[in-house]
Regions:
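N-terminal accessory segment at the very beginning of proteins
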Residues: 1-262, 266-268, 274-276, 281-291, ...
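Beta-sheet entry/capping signal
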Residues: 64-65, 109, 119, 198-199, ...
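Aromatic- and carboxylate-enriched substrate-binding clefts and catalytic-loop regions
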Residues: 70-72, 81, 299-559, 594-598, ...
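Internal mixed beta-strand/loop scaffold within catalytic domains of large alpha/beta enzymes
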Residues: 130-132, 176-189, 194-195, 482-506, ...
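Short, hydrophobic/amphipathic alpha-helical packing segments
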Residues: 155, 175-178, 193, 287, ...
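N-terminal small/glycine-rich loop or linker at the start of catalytic domains
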Residues: 262-276, 373-386
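Catalytic core of carbohydrate-active enzymes
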Residues: 449-462, 468-479, 492-496, 500-510, ...
Length: 772
């Protein structure tokens, strides 16, 4: 919301009350409580007829400082509330001096000044990183609609850039944007977002989580160009400042606080193919797709049935359409015999035509209006109603239906929708409708996730989810929603993926080839390269199929090449996935996250790091023209083997079987021996590639097992012209390729052979000494 009108005025109809002076400070257990008045109250006359703000400073985890600014403490505060991991024994320090009161957790402290002018500062090791000054936080009375708000404005420094706030498709850097965290079904081409997360981070190495599930209004360097303003309709405002000091460290602490991304099963990293949305399909159509992929040697790992596996007008009652799929169990059994995993589409709504609608209504499993009638409308399905997942019995009914599908052979669910949740309703458990609007996405996906956890096991659980709220990163995978079939939408999708990664989500996908309309073949091929160098890869459309031969023969070559490449990259990719699970670092990440000290990376949103070591720059033109930036160092193309200097921009042109994929120097990269499946023994026949190891540096490569744990570690250390290689753990028949090195002066512990990419060394054991 806009509060100010320029620099000196406020918006018509608003009354503002600010904390201006500290009146008193107390220590209450591990909290520091500050009482602040909106005027000078040193004289008793001014201590009457005045509001008094209560500010509570506390720490739910080390290096996280919570701030709660309260006006009326007696206001209703119904749930839901974010499921945060709050620790009770965090060590804090509270200091009360003549000049200030300071609350400290780890390296982060909040300092409130005493005296004539109000000041709230956040400091890292005593150095200010942000804060708010006089008249930049407080209470807003809106006489236009008789609503009351709390707001805060935190300072932005010169050159400070803001990221996150969920999966947003606008410019990656949020500066200058107005953001309302209200889940909407708006596609990828608008300011709306399926996944609104009231958390942002900046390139100064800290993050801020606003702890309100309802709509939070952000003015990011917009209303006040050197401030991030956030406001909420409430009698209190609670937020957490999370220290880094690096972007990775911020996400580590944030996801420790809100939940780590679960580790998806290895098979989910393979290629997914769908029926598409409104296309005509039955078992014969499905088999033609799957057999067509096999005939063309196109690896395929997951097949997805979209909405029309159920009867029209009845979604979602979880009954297969008997006319289209008369033998679903047999069909699934036959498909799984071909080595496929099966996914089916669901959502949290039900059409009035369904035979079970009356039962659900009578049992109270559907969302009601305050007068007791069902909430219904005719969008999406006629007479559509919404499952009330605050009712435990409704959850059990829904879960039992899903368990029946799992028993039939379904492996996972596409949890679509969950954004257009109304507020003129009465929830079974009395939840606040404003808060439940966004939080519904969490309880919906949590319910489905728990079904899979209880049936196939957590190590096999995976969703394909569209909506999300804070904490929903625990239930991967998420995809970017409905995009158009053009380069602009492809770029929008990438921005959304980078944005959600900066918001705590580790795994992300998008509709390869675009969802709406049908892409020209050149767009499809470029998108396939990008999609198969994403954490998860799915071919999906709306009114047309996405099998590659529907475009041209070369599309088959592109899908084959990049699917096989991804399968070979799985030792590297799954180790990065395990790190996302352990630390919250997304697999696909903005350049600024990996290179926070390089200011040239701050605004880059057409390229990304795939894990720690590989830079990918998708091509967004038919001709193949692409520009990209490489940070400091010497970079090598993953398969072309050309080397480029960093700290500069590069311009190239690529065919459809290529794009810029560069590996940074001092990298030891593991490639597997299987180009047909993502799930195999990655420690057997592993081909390690050593890229530009510099004198005095060490490269370490950890090869994961199926559970993400490290089964084998290879280290290469260079001193002068000598490289010492040592392996520990379990590995069979591994090799080491010295990229762009064709000859060595000495080799101990193995044999050597030439290759196009460099000298390949086969060890006799697990130790090598190489003299360059």
């Amino acid at each position: 919301m806009k509060i100010s009108d320029g620099n000196w005025l406020i918006q018509p109809g608003l009354n503002l009350i600010h904390p201006l002076q500290m009146f008193e400070v107390e220590q209450q257990g591990n909290e520091m409580v500050v009482y602040a008045a909106p005027r000078d109250v040193r004289e008793r006359t001014w201590q009457l007829d005045t509001p008094l703000f209560t500010l509570r400073f506390f720490s739910p985890q080390e290096d996280i400082v919570g701030v709660r600014i309260e006006h009326f403490q007696g206001a209703l505060n119904n749930g839901p509330h974010y499921p945060l991991n709050i620790l009770q024994d965090v060590k804090v320090t509270i200091e009360n001096t003549e000049r200030y009161a300071e609350f400290k957790s780890g390296n982060l402290s909040a300092r409130v000044s005493k005296g004539e002018f109000w000041s709230l500062d956040f400091l890292r090791n005593g150095e200010r990183i942000t804060g708010s000054q006089v008249k930049n936080n407080g209470y807003v009375q809106d006489t236009n609609n008789q609503r009351n708000y709390m707001f805060e404005r935190l300072d932005l420094g010169v050159g400070e850039t803001v990221y996150g706030l969920g999966e947003r498709f606008t410019a990656l850097v949020r500066n200058g944007q107005t953001v309302e965290t209200w889940n909407r079904d708006g596609g990828t081409s608008t300011e709306q977002a399926y996944k609104n997360i009231p958390f942002y981070m900046t390139n100064r190495g800290y993050g801020v989580l606003v702890n309100h599930p309802q709509c939070v209004s952000f003015e990011v360097g917009s209303e006040k160009v050197s401030k991030v303003q956030f406001s909420v309709e409430s009698e209190y405002l609670e937020y957490f400042v999370i220290d880094g000091p690096t972007p990775k460290a911020v996400l580590d602490r944030y996801t420790r606080f809100t939940g780590r991304p679960a580790l998806p099963p290895a098979w989910s990293f393979g290629l997914w193919l769908t029926t598409s949305f409104t296309t005509n399909y039955d078992e014969a159509t499905v088999n033609s797709f799957i057999d067509g992929m096999a005939e063309r040697n196109l690896p395929l790992h997951v097949f997805h049935f979209d909405c029309f596996w159920m009867k029209a007008f009845q979604w979602c009652d979880f009954e297969w359409d008997p006319l289209t799929f008369p033998d679903p169990e047999g069909m699934i059994r036959r498909l799984k015999a071909k080595g496929l995993k099966i996914c089916v589409w669901i959502n949290p709504y039900i059409g009035q035509k369904s035979p079970v609608f009356k039962e659900l209504q009578e049992k109270g499993y559907l969302l009601k209006r305050p007068d007791g009638s069902l909430w219904q409308w005719d969008k999406w399905q006629p007479g559509l109603a919404i499952y009330d997942f605050t009712n435990p019995d409704a959850c059990k009914w829904y879960a039992d239906k899903l368990k029946g599908l799992v028993a039939m052979g379904v492996d996972c669910f596409k949890t679509d929708f969950g954004e257009r949740i109304p507020t003129d309703v009465q929830w079974f458990d009395g939840s606040d409708p404003q808060k439940m609007h966004n939080h519904y996405a969490y309880i919906y996906n949590e319910l489905v996730w728990n079904v899979l956890k209880d049936t196939v096991g957590e190590e096999e659980a995976v969703l394909f989810a569209r909506s999300a709220s804070v904490g929903a990163q625990k239930f991967p995978v998420h995809w970017g929603g409905d995009c158009y079939a053009n380069y602009e939408s492809m770029a929008e999708s990438l921005r959304g993926g980078l944005s959600i990664g900066l918001s705590g989500f580790g795994f992300w996908s998008h509709d390869i080839g675009g969802f709406e309309n049908t892409a020209p073949a050149h767009v499809y091929k470029r998108w396939c390269a990008f999609g198969l160098l994403s954490s998860h890869s799915r071919l999906h459309g709306s009114k047309s199929y996405r099998v590659p031969w529907a475009y041209d023969d070369e599309s088959c070559d592109v899908v084959r090449f990049f699917t096989q490449l991804k399968c070979r990259m799985m030792p590297y990719l799954y180790r990065e996935a395990a790190r996302a699970n352990a630390r919250g670092t997304p697999m696909m990440r903005a350049m600024m996250m990996e290179f926070p000290d390089d200011p040239a990376c701050d605004y880059l949103d057409r390229q990304y790091m795939l894990g720690d070591n590989v830079m990918v720059a998708p091509v967004f033109t038919e001709a193949g023209d692409v520009q990209f930036y490489l940070p400091e160092g010497r970079w090598t193309h993953l398969w072309h083997n050309d080397e480029l200097d960093g700290s500069r921009w590069h311009k190239q042109q690529h065919g459809f079987l290529s794009l810029p994929v560069y590996v940074r120097d001092n990298t030891l990269l593991a490639l597997g021996n299987n180009d047909q499946r993502p799930d195999y023994a990655w420690h057997e026949g592993t081909a390690f590639h050593l890229f530009n190891l510099q004198d005095g540096h060490e490269a370490v490569c950890e090869v994961p097992d199926a559970d993400g744990s490290v089964i084998f570690t290879l280290k290469a250390a260079r001193t002068g012209n000598t490289i010492t290689v040592t392996g520990t753990g379990e590995a069979k028949n591994w090799t080491l390729c010295l990229r762009n090195i064709v000859k060595v002066n000495g080799l101990q512990g193995g044999s050597q052979a030439e290759s196009e990419q460099g000298l390949v060394v086969t060890p006799q054991g697990n130790a090598l000494t190489i003299t360059l």
